[in-house]
Amino acid sequence: MARRDALTGKSALSGQSRSHALNATKRKWNLNLQKVRVMDENGSVFNIKVSARTLRTLKKQEKIV
């Protein structure tokens, strides 16, 4: 399973680290993924991985079990 937010589809960003001499090395900025139990409109519960930002939104909407 990819490191991707199950609800928003966000994934890691790629770029370069730059040293003081401006040497470039590839790197990734991974998401802060959390496992969460979520309830949908029908009342069924399932486990998904969401980012910390999405987790805040779910808590606000009271969708977390």
Swiss-Prot record:
Keywords: Ribonucleoprotein, Ribosomal protein. SUPFAM superfamilies: L28p-like. Residues 11-22 have a biased composition (Polar residues). GO terms for molecular function: structural constituent of ribosome. GO terms for biological process: translation. One of its GO terms (cellular component) is ribonucleoprotein complex. Transmembrane segments: none annotated. Residues 1-26 are annotated as: Disordered. Gene3D superfamilies: Ribosomal protein L28/L24. Belongs to the bacterial ribosomal protein bL28 family. HAMAP family: Ribosomal_bL28. This is Large ribosomal subunit protein bL28. It comes from Mycoplasma capricolum subsp. capricolum (strain California kid / ATCC 27343 / NCTC 10154). The lineage of its organism: Bacteria, Bacillati, Mycoplasmatota, Mollicutes, Mycoplasmataceae.
